[in-house]
């Protein structure tokens, strides 16, 4: 059923190796930073792999009072862009660890 002698042991060894690689990848992802932009780069938000905001950069041209609402919208859009980018990066990195192995629908990695 498991490929003969030692098949189950080999399967368990492979599962442990994958678990170790996934843990290492999760740590790497948590430490990485991704920057999202909006307004053609007027607002930039940098977040970590755990979605914590590290830095917000605002072009000085947006610092006028009548630009407040637009600035707020641009910050939200930049954060959403950074969040989308980090999720894409996480999926790519985890796919490299799982070797393209299909995960069950709705399965979320523990991070």
From Swiss-Prot:
Pfam families: YbaB_DNA_bd. Its main location: cytoplasm. Keywords: Cytoplasm, DNA-binding. Residues 1-23, 89-111 are annotated as: Disordered. It comes from the Bacteria. GO terms for molecular function: DNA binding. GO terms for cellular component: bacterial nucleoid; cytosol. The keyword Cytoplasm applies. It is found in: Cytoplasm, Nucleoid. Gene3D superfamilies: Nucleoid-associated protein YbaB-like domain. Binds to DNA and alters its conformation. May be involved in regulation of gene expression, nucleoid organization and DNA protection. Homodimer. Belongs to the YbaB/EbfC family. This is Nucleoid-associated protein VF_1686. It comes from Aliivibrio fischeri (strain ATCC 700601 / ES114) (Vibrio fischeri). The lineage of its organism: Bacteria, Pseudomonadati, Pseudomonadota, Gammaproteobacteria, Vibrionales.
């Amino acid at each position: 059923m498991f490929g003969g002698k030692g098949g189950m042991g080999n399967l368990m060894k492979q599962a442990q190796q994958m678990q170790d690689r996934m843990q290492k990848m999760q740590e790497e992802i948590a430490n990485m930073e991704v920057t999202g932009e909006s307004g053609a780069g007027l607002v930039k938000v940098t977040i970590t792999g755990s979605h914590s905001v590290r830095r917000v950069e605002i072009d000085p041209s947006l610092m006028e009072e009548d630009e407040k609402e637009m600035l707020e919208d641009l910050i939200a859009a930049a954060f959403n862009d950074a969040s989308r980018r980090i999720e894409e990066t996480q999926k790519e990195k985890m796919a490299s660890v799982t070797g393209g192995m299909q995960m069950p629908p709705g399965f979320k990695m523990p991070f």
